[in-house]
Amino acid sequence: MIKIFEKRSFANFNFSIKMSKAQENLKVPVEKKEIGQTGRFVRENQKSLSFIGGAVIAMILIYIAYQKFYIGPREVTASNQMYVAQDFWAKKDWDKAINGDAGYPGFQKIINDYGNTKAANLAYFYLGIAYLNKGEYSKAIDNLTNYRGGDNMVAANALGSTADAYVELKDYDKAETYFKKAADKANNKFLTPMYLKKLGLVYEAQNDNKSADDAYKRIKSEYPDSPQATNIEEYIARVEAKL
């Protein structure tokens, strides 16, 4: 039996070699044909290809010039004008932070005048928080959701504040979505437990006590040293009594 098996294996092996060589022989002319066709295409369309290549290079150069000579100076100007509005914001003078005063622009004008700059992008965050504190929740949401930042702390704050605005509007489904995003985005021991606790409260408002229990228990297990964990057992006991 062993010898028969070996003979069959050897026969199959020889057959495979023959097939592989046959396939290689078949591929060669096809590959040569394809190469020839490519070369002919390049020769016949050399002018068009050169034009396309030149156009791409021109577009790259225009973009670099646009960034350097247009966006760059506007970025500096917008950043310089942000300082006074930020000072109003820090002092909780929300109206002046939004609209500015006689001498300096507020965040709204900075967005309007320098909308494609990093400074204007950050202004969306400041403006959203200002409207949130003024109780203008829809405007807060509009501005906070326009913020596109790479900084995790600011981005998490923007998401969490958006959730706060939805809570005030009693749109608990969207509040839940944004608190989840905020907790995940923050991914730290300071903000994440805070947003998890708020998420638990939103679940409770919707009578989803199981999900609330999960959120509170996550604080207990993952963030035991956070301020939110201090009395979290009371929250857990409360929702578990309703399960």
Task: Label the predicted regions.
Residues F13-A55:
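N-terminal positive-inside, membrane-proximal cytosolic segments immediately preceding the first
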Residues G72, I111-A120, K134, R148-A156, ...:
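Short solvent-exposed coil/turn linkers within tandem alpha-helical repeat scaffolds
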